């Protein structure tokens, strides 16, 4: 049995072209009729008359044949048009039959799971509506989640995207109503599929825009959904961007945060008055609090904060293994992995090195005692955990361009769009701002964090002291040679200047209120105090040295 494939639209087009050809031929025949059927004799003799009569007869025969061909051509064109209509009708009937058959078949397949679980076995979930804003779940076996409903009422959270079953993608979250949070993206399939993107936060002409919805997470294989963008607020800034979803347990990239704020600022929390802390997402592990430390260079985190052992596998082979230490008495072994760092609000680095702690050991009485005490409450506590427990962080983000380590890179310098040229630490304002300095400088010091400062004790002559301007140094240190003894004297005023002219003060304190640790040798450490007094901008220029800029309070 032979099969003929017909495209009705082609038949209709061919018929139209035939009609166009017929019109052209008719016009040509009409133009040729008089010259070819009414030939005049060249002369009055019998031969000329016979020749003219002969050729005129040929013209008349041609016109008769042309008339017959024109009628045939018109009939053929009508037949083509009729055939196209017949095939279109047959095709529409076939589609209708197949649709009905498909609905019947899938209806029979999905009926048991619809009755028991309220979702199909195969098929996409229904999109959200005003009365039921959350997208429906996709088929248990195969199908995408439905799209969440975008709200029109003020303050109403956008509908969540539906989750997939075994295979399929999560549905996108819906946009929030005015000032409200966008809906969360649905999760991807348990086996394979990507998470849905979070819904956009609701715009708000009277206040702050809504927060973007969370991106959906993947199952075993698939990418996490990106977080939704924050809604536009009255100030022109966006609301906070939603966090991205986690990538596949075995394979898949994580979703990045949605655009938010002004595109260069993230919240900064001050813990215990002394610790500037922000949250980062590395390799899709989870949001992790890290200390902003101008006294070091490089991001140091633990295995649990980069997705665990499987997270290490997803990052591939390390680019290096090394050891480093913190001055308070903690030594650690780490491996450097290439990955990205997400600061939130869509601020994400290009691939950069992140140091993952593999093993740590306390090397001071303080660090050892802290660890042993922590073991009583949690036997799985690592020395690294215990060392930074009081700071409320799980890692350290070193941002100092001329700090000694651990390196090998500073993630904030891997930000694009000009955001990698520096950062502002505003502890009292509660902000970490990337890119050019947004405030007015008061004075600057060459070097970040290592620089030479001048120290005066009780108004005496200043002494040049090599120092670390260290946001993570808590109370800091002071060399015994500066104060003339191994013990910090009471009722003593310490003033730190930019140079020996004593015209520009960096900071000052009374030893009754601020008590740095006395050291026998090494660099003086400012501790957190200068950063608490006023905003400080770390400029990565000149390369390898940097500049510490103190902005107007």
Curated annotation (Swiss-Prot):
Tell me where in this chain the PE domain is found.
1-92
Keywords linked to the UniProt accession: Aspartyl protease, Hydrolase, Protease, Secreted, Virulence
Q: What post-translational events are described?
A: Undergoes auto-proteolytic processing.
The effect of disrupting this gene, in the record's words, is: Disruption of the gene does not affect LipY surface localization. Mutant shows moderate attenuation in the zebrafish larva infection model.
Main location (coarse class):
secreted
Active-site residues are 293
Per its UniProt record, what InterPro entries does this chain match?
PE-PGRS_N, PecA_C, Peptidase_aspartic_dom_sf, PGRS_rpt
Q: Does the keyword Secreted apply?
A: yes
Q: Per its UniProt record, what Pfam families does this chain match?
A: PE, PE-PGRS_C, PGRS
Mind listing the GO biological process terms from this record? proteolysis
Report which superkingdom the organism of origin falls in.
Bacteria
Q: Which GO terms describe its molecular function?
A: aspartic-type endopeptidase activity
Q: Where are the transmembrane segments?
A: none
What task does this protein carry out?
Aspartic protease that processes the lipase LipY and other PE_PGRS proteins. Can also cleave itself. Cleaves LipY both inside the PE domain, before amino acid 98, and after amino acids 136 and 149. Involved in virulence.
The record's listing under NCBIfam families reads: PE_process_PecA
Descriptive protein name: PE cleavage protein A
């Amino acid at each position: 049995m032979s099969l003929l494939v017909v495209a009705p639209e082609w038949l209709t087009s061919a018929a139209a072209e035939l009609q166009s050809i017929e019109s052209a031929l008719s016009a040509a025949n009409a133009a040729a009729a008089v010259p070819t059927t009414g030939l005049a004799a060249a002369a009055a003799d019998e031969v000329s008359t016979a020749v003219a009569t002969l050729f005129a007869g040929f013209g008349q025969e041609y016109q008769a044949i042309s008339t017959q061909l024109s009628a045939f051509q018109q009939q053929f064109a009508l037949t083509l048009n009729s055939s196209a209509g017949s095939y279109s009708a047959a095709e529409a009937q076939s589609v209708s039959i197949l649709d009905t058959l498909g609905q019947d078949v899938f209806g029979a397949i999905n009926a048991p799971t619809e009755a028991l679980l309220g979702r199909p076995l195969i098929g996409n979930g229904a999109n959200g509506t005003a009365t039921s804003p959350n997208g429906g779940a996709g088929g248990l076996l195969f199908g995408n989640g439905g799209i969440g409903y975008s709200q029109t009422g003020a303050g109403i959270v956008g509908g969540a995207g539906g989750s997939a079953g075994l295979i399929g993608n999560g549905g996108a979250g819906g946009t929030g109503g005015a000032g409200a949070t966008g809906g969360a993206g649905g999760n991807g399939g348990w086996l394979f599929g990507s998470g849905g993107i979070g819904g956009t936060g609701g715009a708000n002409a009277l206040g702050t825009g809504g927060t973007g919805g969370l991106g959906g997470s993947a199952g075993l294989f698939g990418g996490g959904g990106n977080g939704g963008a924050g809604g536009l607020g009255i100030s022109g800034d966006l609301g906070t961007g939603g966090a991205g979803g986690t990538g596949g347990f075995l394979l898949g990239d994580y979703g990045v945060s949605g655009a938010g704020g002004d595109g260069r600022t993230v919240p900064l929390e001050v813990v215990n008055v002394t610790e500037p802390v922000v949250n980062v997402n590395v390799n899709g592990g989870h949001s992790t609090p890290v200390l902003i430390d101008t006294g070091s260079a490089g991001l140091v985190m633990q295995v649990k904060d980069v997705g665990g052992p499987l997270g290490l596998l997803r990052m591939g082979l390390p680019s290096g293994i090394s050891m480093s230490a913190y001055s308070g008495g903690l030594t650690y072994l780490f491996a450097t992995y290439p990955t990205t760092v997400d600061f939130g609000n869509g601020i994400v680095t290009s691939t950069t090195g992140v140091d993952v702690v593999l093993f740590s050991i306390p090397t001071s009485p303080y660090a050892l005692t802290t660890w042993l005490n922590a073991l009583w409450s949690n036997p799985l506590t690592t020395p690294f955990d215990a060392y930074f427990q009081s700071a409320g962080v799980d890692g350290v983000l070193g941002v100092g361009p001329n700090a000694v380590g651990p390196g090998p890179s500073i993630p904030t310098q891997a930000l694009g769009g000009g955001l990698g040229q520096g950062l502002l630490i505003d502890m009292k304002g509660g902000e970490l701002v990337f890119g050019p300095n947004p405030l007015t400088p008061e004075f600057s010091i060459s070097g970040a964090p290592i620089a030479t400062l001048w120290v005066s004790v009780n108004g005496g002559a200043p002494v040049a002291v090599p120092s670390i301007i260290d946001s993570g140094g808590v109370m800091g240190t002071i060399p015994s040679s500066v104060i003339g003894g191994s013990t910090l004297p009471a009722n003593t005023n310490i003033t730190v200047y930019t140079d020996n002219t004593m015209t520009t003060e960096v900071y000052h304190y009374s030893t009754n209120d601020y008590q740095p640790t006395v050291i026998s040798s090494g660099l003086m450490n400012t501790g957190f105090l200068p950063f608490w007094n006023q905003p400080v901008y770390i400029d990565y220029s000149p390369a390898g040295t940097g500049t510490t800029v103190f902005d107007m309070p």
